[in-house]
Amino acid sequence: MATIGRETTISWLGHGTFHILTPGGKKVLIDAWVDGNPSCPDEWKQRVRSEGLDVIFLTHGHFDHIADILALANETSATIVGQFDITSWIASKGVSQDRLVGFNKGGTVEVAGIRATMTHATHSSTFTDNGVIVPMGTEAGYVLRMENGFTIYHTGDTAVTMDMQIIGDLYHPELVILPIGDHFTMDPMQAAYALKLIRPTFAIPEHYGTFPILRGTPDQLREQCNAFGVNVTVIDLKPGESVS
């Protein structure tokens, strides 16, 4: 497996959930679906609690990205970051406002030494709360700059958009995390074109294989990258695996 070499460890917990150990020792979760996530190893369901979390970034409000946010809010001391609509809903459930950072696309915040810029995505964002479908703002991604300047772009659930070229031009992310599963997000061909626009060194595919309908594969992503002439190292993690 390739190595990143940027004092950062990225672990895939399955589906769209990632754990990042930053150069400064901060523990970061991107999206909060662990307990009901069929791809998440039992070890990680315990580790996110026993080791604690400093920050949780939420990309949007679908159950497979926020189902465990209230439990993790109660069981860790993490600061929770997301679009204002999502953090307002979390506050309505009793989570203290001083643990919530709500902002919006184009905005940048600094949390636990990490500079986070919220980016555009194109998807949808609702949550079923006690049988009622609740709007959760709009879908988003994040450009995350670690304490040492290492820059990660998590696209969130999305199709390919030309905004990705702007993100590449402005922020020059070295590593991109992006979905390849098809049906609910872009497929491997669109993901390869997204990487052509962004021009990172590394890519980690996600949001595939959890359910049969999410049929894109890392090998298909590599094939499409070759077809588009994209020079990128695709890091094919299995759920529970890490890369540093």
UniProtKB/Swiss-Prot annotation:
Name of the featured protein: UPF0173 metal-dependent hydrolase RoseRS_3945
Pfam families documented for this protein: Lactamase_B_2
Keyword match Hydrolase: yes
GO MF term (any one): hydrolase activity
Superkingdom field: Bacteria
Family under the similarity heading: Belongs to the UPF0173 family.
Alphabetically ordered keywords of this record: Hydrolase
NCBIfam families: PRK00685.1
